[in-house]
Amino acid sequence: GHRLIASTVGFLTIIMAVWLWRAEPRRWLRWFGVATLGSVIAQGLLGGLTVLFFLPAVISTAHAGLAEIFFCMTVAIAIFTSPGWIAGYAPGTEPRPGLSGEPGPTLRLLATAATVLIYTQIIVGATMRHTGAGLAIPDFPLMFGHLIPDHWSSAIAIHFTHRVGALLVSGAILTVFAHVRSRYRDHRELMRPAALMVGLVVVQVTLGAMTVLSRRDPWTNSFHVLCGALVLTTSLIVTLRAWRGSIADRGLRIADSIEDSGADSRGSQLIHNPIRNPQSTIRNDRARA
């Protein structure tokens, strides 16, 4: 089942990369699609090595970490090709006094830090899972009946790091949500994923506790891994949308080769599709300015 799903994902990624290369006017995004295809190929190679070498911890952890990166890359492509990203997100209502317009550097910093922290936490969790440290601390919420373990080993240290990481991630997500709610609550494209992050992290912490208390029940453990991926990609969505203005200012949103689009079949398609036509977006942006 795992190999069949992996093959299907690889096939769909090939289709996506080819589609981007043929139809997407933004050169950087076409190459991003190629990089995404490269990541899924590398993921398949790591999967093969994992089997050949009988699940070594280092390769298995790298396999898990690259899977998260590939997932994030596909989500990023979905964001980059969405009408909201291309045309610009509009507040749900008229901005109210005291609220900000475009996301500023503080939100960008907070969201980026949260995303990096979540990914680091996932890597620590994968290390814990593949080194057999999942039950190194068998109780919850205490650790051997104490707030801090009264004895140590490498497995206990990894498990303890994962629990501390959960606290840090929860704090980072709550900080991002509080900042978005206080400054950008009229921006639905930020408020919705920020609020979803809070709900997901509550579920994730609950699943983590249940994983320990159930002695690593396979279903509970699997949903814990799944929810972690959802927390990561939801944070990534907030991060990308917070950085959108800066990315657009650097010209990455618009293909630097659009002037050559008339030389191939993409040109006529873009002219008749205002959402997919970056030149039209430029004119609209200038008109709004």
Name each region found by the language model.
Residues 86-94, 100-102, 247-285:
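Short, basic, low-complexity termini and linkers enriched in Ser/Thr/Gly/Pro
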Residues 1-92, 99-248, 286-289:
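Polytopic transmembrane helical bundles with strong interfacial aromatic enrichment
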